[in-house]
C-alpha cells in the first residue's frame, strides 16, 4: 500500500492536490486496487487505474504510461505515473513506512526531515530532526548505518531522494514516509477528529 500526494494540474493553473492510495501485490507488483481523494480530475485518474487493473498492469506499466498532457488538465508527469514510480521503487527494494507505523514505532526510529528549516518550523513529524537534503551526506557520517531511519519531505519525492542517498552510502534500514509530511499531518488530524467523536 502506498500514498501519493500530487496536484491535478500545475500550481500556476490553480492545481489542487489529490491523494492516491494504491495497493500492489508485493510479489509481482501487480496493481490490485486504488482510491483517490481530491477535486477535479480524480475521475480521470481512477478510470486510468481501473483500466490498468482490468488489463493486469503492474507498477512498471503505470510508470511507463503515456498520458495526455496540457497544463489546464494535468501536470507534466501525471499523478498516475508518479504512483507507478513509487510502486516501482518499492518493488526494487525501496521501503516505505506509513504515518501510523511512524507513530507506533517513534521511539525506535531516527526521523529525518529533509525539507528546508522554514518548512520544518511550520510543522513536522513528532521527534524529527531537520537535515535539509543538501546537508544529508555530511550529516550521514555521524549516523549508525544499522539504525532504522525514516526520511521524509512534503509529499515523498525528496524523501525518496534522501532514502537513495543513504542507501547508496551503505545504510541498511532506510524507509521513506508514504505520502510525506502532508499525509502524516492528515493522518494526525483524522485521529484527533476520531477521538472527539468517540
Please report, for each region that a protein language model flagged, where it lies by residue.
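Rhodanese-like catalytic fold shared by cysteine-dependent sulfurtransferases
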Residues: 60-110, 117-150, 154-198
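Glycine-rich phosphate/pyrophosphate-binding beta-alpha loops
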Residues: 6-10, 35-43, 70-72
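A short, polar/charged loop-to-alpha-helix boundary motif
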Residues: 40-59
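Structured beta-strand/loop patches that form or line metal/cofactor-binding pockets in enzymes
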Residues: 1-27
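Hydrophobic "anchor" residues
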Residues: 30-31
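Anionic group-transfer/hydrolysis microenvironments
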Residues: 23, 115-117
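Short, conserved beta-strand edge motifs with alternating hydrophobic and charged residues
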Residues: 1-2, 111-114
